[in-house]
Structures are given as C-alpha cells and as structure tokens.
Amino acid sequence: MARYTGATCRLCRREGMKLFLKGDRCFTDKCAFVRRSYAPGQHGANKKKVSNYGVQLREKQKARRIYGILEGQFRTYYEKAEHIKGITGENLLKLLEMRLDNIVYRLGYGSSRNEARQLVTHGHFLVNGKKVDICSYHVSVNDVITVCEKSRSSEKFKTFVENPKTLPKWLEANVDNYEGKVVAEPSREDIDVPVNETLIVELYSK
C-alpha cells in the first residue's frame, strides 16, 4: 500500500500545530516544530491570507496526516460516512477511529499511529483469534485485539504493558493477557483529535 515517505516533521509545520506523528519525540525539545513552528519552504515564515477553500483544505489535510491516510482512501471513507445515518463529519471520524492501526495506538501498543501501523503490518496482532496485518481493517464493537503469543517476549511489548495507557471509555484492556476490546463505538466527545470535521464536509460538498 502507498504511504507518505517524506519528512514527518514537515507535516506538523505545514499544519501549524503538533500532530504528534513521532510519538514520544514530539514531547521533547528535539521536536522540529518547537524550533521552527512556521511552514516549511523558503517563504514559510511569511504569513499569508488564506481563503475559505484554503482553510477547508488544510483541515482535511490535517485529518489525513493525523490518521496517516492518502487522499484516495480518505475520500472513500468520506463517501462511506455519507451513507451512514447520522452526521457525516462525525461518521467520518468514527470510521477512522475504528481502523485497526488506530485501535492498536489507542490501546497503547505504540507511541504514535505510525508505530502502531508498523506493528500491525509486521503481524503482531490477532483480531478475535485470527492474525490480521491490514492497517485499515475495520474493527467492530465486541472485537477482541490480542498481541500474538510469540510477540509478547519483545521488550517493546513488555514496556507497553509495564506502562499502560489511559484508555478512552469505548475501549477496555486486560493488560496481563495482552488483550484489548472495543466495548462501544466512540462518540464525538471521545475522539480527541484537533479537527473541525464540519470544514471537511464543506470541502467535499462543493
């Protein structure tokens, strides 16, 4: 599957805020955004007037970059969200939250979504007892995500278990069993991403 291979820190600078794409590094002074919080490029430090379209586009780009999704796949998620009963923007975020790589990140098995994505593609997880290595796999309510038996001896997973993450209320975990479960769909209030999904809907509605 195609993916972004450029400098990750440039994405945060482009959006004008930390997107926490590098996990723990983003909380240190080594974070590039701390040193240069303006947009990348020769004229990045110069403030420009942004049109309504530009604001909407930036919001969509921000959401894509937070979840690590390319344009075509993001549009597919939007089209699915349109056909689900409810508010399209909220439906979009819920679909993104229910991706396997995001669930793994939310459970604490990865300091960033990018790291969680790598762990999934390397085959470290089971969903309902079956190995799944597809990051975009849609996890459903009552699905159980488990770390593979052979992966549990890894220092990386031991560290995650020794330092459990605070979970959103729609997830629960059995740390000793290296297991997590989706107990409900996330509500909009549960999704702590700095995105105004209404602007994304306005962009795609044109």
Swiss-Prot record:
One Gene Ontology molecular-function label: rRNA binding
Organism this protein belongs to: Clostridium beijerinckii (strain ATCC 51743 / NCIMB 8052) (Clostridium acetobutylicum)
Family: Belongs to the universal ribosomal protein uS4 family.
The UniProt record lists the keyword rRNA-binding: yes
Gene: rpsD
Pfam families per the UniProt record, alphabetical: Ribosomal_S4, S4
Swiss-Prot/TrEMBL keywords: Ribonucleoprotein, Ribosomal protein, RNA-binding, rRNA-binding
PANTHER family xref list: 30S 40S RIBOSOMAL PROTEIN, SMALL RIBOSOMAL SUBUNIT PROTEIN US4M
Protein name (Swiss-Prot/TrEMBL): Small ribosomal subunit protein uS4
